[in-house]
Every structure is written in structure tokens, then in C-alpha cells.
Curated annotation (Swiss-Prot):
Segments passing through the bilayer: 47-67, 152-172, 173-193
This protein's encoding gene: TIM22
Highest taxon listed in the record's lineage: Eukaryota
GO biological process: protein insertion into mitochondrial inner membrane
Keyword match Mitochondrion: yes
Keywords tagged on the record: Disulfide bond, Membrane, Mitochondrion, Mitochondrion inner membrane, Protein transport, Translocation, Transmembrane, Transmembrane helix, Transport
Phylogenetic placement of the source organism: Eukaryota, Fungi, Dikarya, Ascomycota, Saccharomycotina
Segments on the Mitochondrial intermembrane side according to the record's topology features: 1-46, 194-207
Name of this chain's protein: Mitochondrial import inner membrane translocase subunit TIM22
Principal subcellular localisation of the protein: mitochondrion
Length: 207
């Protein structure tokens, strides 16, 4: 007697119903499934990491800008007297530029300068962190999918591409050095995070 199995090879997978034919519960499950599929895909990981990095970078940049000290500031002041309008400090349009402390300015101008500076620094930091998160997560996911492996080399390669992308405007040498530095940093982080994944020692549960 030849064993032919349980006939599972003759069973065809269930066809998905159109969305408008589903019950409210099934529609919710279908929507959750679509969201999870997108979140676990490479484009989804890249988008989520980019948005998260942008938000964290903005908060960090805002915090660092708010901790700045009162430093000399070059601000244009009207040249009302001949004593201030000297040849060394006259700017464009008859405006003399003098070095002032921020605390010497009117309160409204102080607030305007501070918020403008904080906004610029926060936006710059957010762009950098968002770029790092988006490129790193996307490249790592693509490499992991192609290699079908989850090891340290995925992060090292992603770190190299990310660092090179950040420094490519400064030339090929800077891109190479930036990629190598970011790859080394990524390798160190991965080694630290995976240091507890190994086999426990033999005396782990012994007193």
C-alpha cells in the first residue's frame, strides 16, 4: 500500500475577499495586517527610522541650542555718529557692524535671535539624524534580505554607506574615511549589543 498523504497538496489556499465584502472585524484585521507588512518591509523600516531620527535629532538639537552660552554676536547697528562710522566697521548701506553681547540687546531682539538660532540648529540636527536613520535602516534591511543572514556584516556595510553618504560632498577621500569610521562605530555597537547572545558559561547556575 502506497502512502499518498492526507491530500494537502490538493487543497488550494483561500482566496482573499474584496475589502468591501469583509465584516468590520475582518476589515480591521486586514488593515492591521497591511500596516504590519509595511512596517516590516525595507521601505517601511527606512521611513520609520527616518521619521524617528528626524524627531530625535530635532529634540537633541533644540536642547543643545538652548544650552549655548552668551557669546559675542555680530549685529548691525545704525551709524548715528561719526565716531562709530569708522573705516574699519562700516558695512553695506552705511551700517556699522560692532561686536556685541546678546545680553546688551533689547529683550525682543534677544528672543528673536535665540529662537531663530535654536530653530536652525534643531532643523539641521533633525535632518542629519533623519538621514542617518533612513539610509542605515534601508541599506541594512536590503543587505539582510539579499544575504538571508542576520549578522554583524549587515550593520557594518550599512554603516559604511551611511558614513560615506554623509561626507561625500567633501570628496572621495572624506567619503571613504567617513564610511570607515561609521562602519567601525556600527561594528562596535553591534558587538556590544550581541555580546550576551552567546552560550552561557558552564557554571552559570552553580552557586
Amino acid at each position: 500500500m502506497v502512502y499518498t498523504g492526507f491530500g494537502l497538496e490538493q487543497i488550494s489556499p483561500a482566496q482573499k475577499k474584496p475589502y468591501n465584502e469583509l465584516t468590520p472585524e475582518e476589515q480591521g484585521e486586514r488593515g492591521a495586517e497591511m500596516i504590519m507588512n509595511f512596517m516590516t518591509s525595507c521601505p517601511g523600516k527606512s521611513v520609520v527610522s527616518g521619521v524617528t531620527g528626524f524627531a530625535l535629532g530635532g529634540v537633541l538639537g533644540l536642547f543643545m541650542a538652548s544650552m549655548a552660552y552668551d557669546t559675542p554676536l555680530h549685529t548691525p547697528t545704525p551709524a548715528n555718529t561719526a565716531a562709530t562710522a569708522t573705516a574699519g566697521n562700516i558695512g553695506v548701506g552705511g551700517i556699522s557692524r560692532t561686536v556685541q553681547q546678546i545680553s546688551d540687546l533689547p529683550f525682543r531682539q534677544q528672543m528673536k535671535l535665540q529662537f531663530t538660532d535654536m530653530g536652525k540648529k534643531s532643523y539641521s540636527s533633525a535632518k542629519n539624524f533623519g538621514y542617518i536613520g533612513m539610509i542605515y535602516a534601508g541599506v541594512e534591511c536590503v543587505i539582510e534580505s539579499l544575504r538571508a543572514k542576520n549578522d554583524i556584516y549587515n550593520g557594518v556595510t550599512a554603516g559604511f554607506f551611511t558614513g560615506a553618504g554623509l561626507a561625500y560632498k567633501a570628496g572621495p577621500q572624506a567619503a571613504l574615511m567617513g564610511g570607515a569610521g561609521f562602519a567601525a562605530f556600527s561594528a562596535a555597537i553591534d558587538l556590544y549589543m550581541k555580546s550576551e547572545d552567546g552560550r552561557p558559561p558552564q557554571n552559570d547556575f552553580k552557586e
